[in-house]
Amino acid sequence: MSRNYFGTDGIRGRANGLITPELALKVGQAAGLLFQRGEHRHRVVIGKDTRLSGYMIEYAMVAGFTSVGMDVLLVGPMPTPAVAMLTKSMRADLGVMISASHNLFEDNGIKLFGPQGFKLSDDVEKQIEQLLDESLDKKLAQSASLGRARRIDGVHDRYIEFAKRTLPRDLSLDGLRVVVDCANGAAYKVVPEALWELGADVISIGVEPDGFNINKECGSTSPEALCRKVREMRADIGIALDGDADRVILVDERGHIVDGDQLLAVIAQSWKEDGRLSRPGIVATVMSNLGLERFLQGQGLELVRTPVGDRYVLERMLADGYNLGGEQSGHIILSDYATTGDGFVAALQVLATVQKLRRPVSEVCHKFDPLPQILKNVRYRSGKPLDTDAVKSAIDTGQKRLNGHGRLLVRSSGTEPVIRVMGEGDDRNLVEEVVDDIVTAVGNAAAAA
């Protein structure tokens, strides 16, 4: 069965476009029916980020869940990993994060977590999709069995304590000046507070959400403001989170960006030296730079690749027993601590390494020289541009031109109508020519559809 609603990271789209109150209500009903197992009172934890449409979707989902007899615990703006953690710790049957992650405020989305705090599998999402296409009127709860909803206090402190416990008890961030950019998103309260409690000198930006400014010229997808602030304040490090704080990008004291691949390299090397890697390797996606793979090989570590999407990284980690994985975009999964990507906890692991080594971030966090990597996006309205003969021919020609001295990846986005064309290799000019040829072919195919 084709997937009409779920992408690689839940359901995501334009608020009041794809993501309507009607859809949110139906998702609440469908997921609520599917996760009511056993005779106990069933409940769901719902969190959100700071975008304006969060109110609309939150209340619609409350109506959906309570209409099928589930109690709802509302935690308000909280990081996605915090919602996953709370779902498990509060013994809920289900967790929901209302967020479109790094997208601007016009979009929103629905991420679902099972009772152990893990994102739902493809099979479970397909079951929910089947229910979305059915009439559920006859499956609603009786009047006396409707669910209740209430807001929960103290959840911020729970997450702060959880994050702090991922560091050694005797480790302090005293002496570190940290600029943190919370993207005017879900982490705007908890992360600055946690850093302060750990002893850092904290300078916060992106902590004034108004419903419209989430991810707007700030956060991990737009770290330029953070780079400037780090240099201006002569800070030791900058931390950029995205709107729901499940991804992170760092900035060194010189204002240079440290992406997810470099973070994986730092943590992998540190954990190997401390004997903390459960297996001699890590898991990343097909988008991770070949430079990371070569660095890990030099450390005696393997890089296992998966399709794009942190859920696929985690699935491979769990299946094969790895405890470190992530994406170039900054989703870092530390399965010893969390069930999903946690940008803040990942940043703390790097800060711990910096404190242990007592060296500048620029020396600690740039582990390898990345190969030239070029990524271009082509939007399309309809059809399947990748299935055309012209595009297939362009890809085949590009592979032959790289001739084993680089990589080529052409794929459809799982969250928006975009074809992503990525090439990397030792010869930047050749890579750029190959990528441009494929982009032209995809653009022509999209225009003809």
From Swiss-Prot:
EC number: 5.4.2.10
PANTHER family: PHOSPHOGLUCOMUTASE (ALPHA-D-GLUCOSE-1,6-BISPHOSPHATE-DEPENDENT), PHOSPHOHEXOSE MUTASE
Xref: HAMAP family: GlmM_B
Gene: glmM
Swiss-Prot/TrEMBL GO biological process terms: carbohydrate metabolic process; peptidoglycan biosynthetic process; UDP-N-acetylglucosamine biosynthetic process
Swiss-Prot/TrEMBL cofactor(s): Mg(2+)
Source species of the chain: Bradyrhizobium sp. (strain ORS 278)
Protein name per UniProt: Phosphoglucosamine mutase
Superkingdom to which the source organism belongs: Bacteria
Phosphoserine sites (modified residues): S101
Broad enzyme group: isomerase
Gene3D superfamilies per record: Alpha-D-Glucose-1,6-Bisphosphate, subunit A, domain 3, Alpha-D-phosphohexomutase, C-terminal domain
